[in-house]
């Protein structure tokens, strides 16, 4: 490109006839300076011959001639003559120059042409570089940020303009709306928790107290509320174990996907005050929590035991008023006898210690089953002879087979034969017991000492018994909100020998503050009250729900008989099955079991619905039927079937498909021909298998075919269709 541009410039220079009068030495000097000024640009060498000028002249002449020929067409013959003359003159001049060749310096002409070409190329390249720089600078000016030179001093950095960002304006209205929505969501969650707990427990005041105390606790931590520390932490705002069990059962039924972690979170939410109460106990809290048996705290217990006495402890102290000829029954969770004679005082003390240790290590259920009553040694008051070995063996056997806790029975007074069964755990409360070391020794050695056992308060008594035994004692019930001074109270720190002939009543105290015990004056007079000490009839006050279980339990025993049954009090809590009945149990020494041990396991308090009965049929694997009476008959038949398990132990009644499978397997083992075909993997038709099993037991007709096929698949028995022949 540079060479072609230089060639064009040179041609224009020759055509215009411009001549350079610069001396040869000066041209050479300029050419040398131009060489030093260049930035390394190399120009290709051009070899000019001696007759370059002649060639150029001839070329110029030919060009003029060519132009002349072109103009002839336009101007005519006159122009042709003029151009021919000019051509002739040019040729003569050229000839003259060539003839004077000796006088002309050829080096000057050659150097002149080279210098012109070199200068034009250098100038053009520098112009191109300058244009590129301008273009780049123009592009850089489009940037928002100012160009910073690396070599620039730091003092000049501050002089440049720096754009400041304008702060964004916040919408105060939007923030206010967000705060309102957040407060609404918090209040909504609190209302939901409040309503849920009210539905589950039915105690509005307790739920409100929980929410209120929890809010005070949170505000006291954050420092928002200064008077939060003045709020008293009362144990009446927490739920007991039985209340929490009831709430958890309702949650399980309503929310089937509830996990154990959710239960723990809800329990911590409800009983959040428990840890705080343990850290900072007050007088009321200490009176409701049992003293720890830790050895490290033994000295503390001995020093401060006298300052932690509650009214319930003072009223419940029996150490100074027990009579030697009176007997006090107690509950035996380990299956021992219920009642002991009071003459053996040392044995009674040991028994009370066993009960206290058992109750402190086990969680006593409030509603206990009556199945433990089946084989227990119940003998009448005043009976001092030992039970027979046969009775002892039977009791131990029945206790081992019993899977349900014993029935709680309590007996009070003399010559009345009254026993009371409790259906709620609210009556079982731990009391701070009074250490015997702070009391003076008692004269009567037959009186048992105070031990750390759970006291069972009297549930109810007939009015006649109260009139006979408690003429001088007023009715004291802390749960009813009334209190009257009684002159027969015994102090635990004084000698109680002056009141040995007195009778004391159990004072029921309520942990939650809600009265649940019956008013003794509201109990009607029972039609049977004349019980002899030597008789073997015992009176029990029991709920309707437990009465049904008691009837089923005594069916298998011949030594216990239910003779009388009377309703004492109607429903008190608004729940079905909570009515109270007074029943009389007759105990005999006949220990033989009844001939028909079958018990209908499907007996319920209410008549089950048809859908529930069909579910029971499907669970066992029996054939479906339409009528409810037929379903009940089939279930009754299933409850009387005798099965043999893998350990060759007989069981009465089937309640699942696995027990039906054991029943069918037992029938197959009794048929040698059928057993041989099964062992040899010979195919058996379904009809043949059912017929052979039916011959052994007619209960097979009630079993569904699908259940039988499932049993054959489990054992690997080859079954084929009935239409195929052998």
UniProtKB/Swiss-Prot annotation:
PTM note: Phosphorylated in response to DNA damage.
Q: Which organism is it from?
A: Candida glabrata (strain ATCC 2001 / BCRC 20586 / JCM 3761 / NBRC 0622 / NRRL Y-65 / CBS 138) (Yeast)
Q: Which domain of life is it from?
A: Eukaryota
Which residues lie within the region annotated Disordered? Answer: 156-187
User: What is one term from the GO cellular component aspect held by the record?
Assistant: Slx1-Slx4 complex
Basic residues biased stretches: 161-173
Quaternary structure? Forms a heterodimer with SLX1.
Q: What is the stated purpose of this protein?
A: Regulatory subunit of the SLX1-SLX4 structure-specific endonuclease that resolves DNA secondary structures generated during DNA repair and recombination. Has endonuclease activity towards branched DNA substrates, introducing single-strand cuts in duplex DNA close to junctions with ss-DNA.
The record's annotation in InterPro entries points to: Slx4_ascomycetes, Structure-sp_endonuc_su_Slx4
Cell location? Nucleus
Q: Into which family does the record put it? A: Belongs to the SLX4 family.
What is the name of the protein in this document? Answer: Structure-specific endonuclease subunit SLX4
Which GO terms are recorded in the biological process aspect for this UniProt protein?
A: DNA recombination; DNA repair; DNA replication
For this UniProt record, the keywords arranged alphabetically read as follows: DNA damage, DNA recombination, DNA repair, Nucleus, Phosphoprotein
One Gene Ontology MF term: 5'-flap endonuclease activity
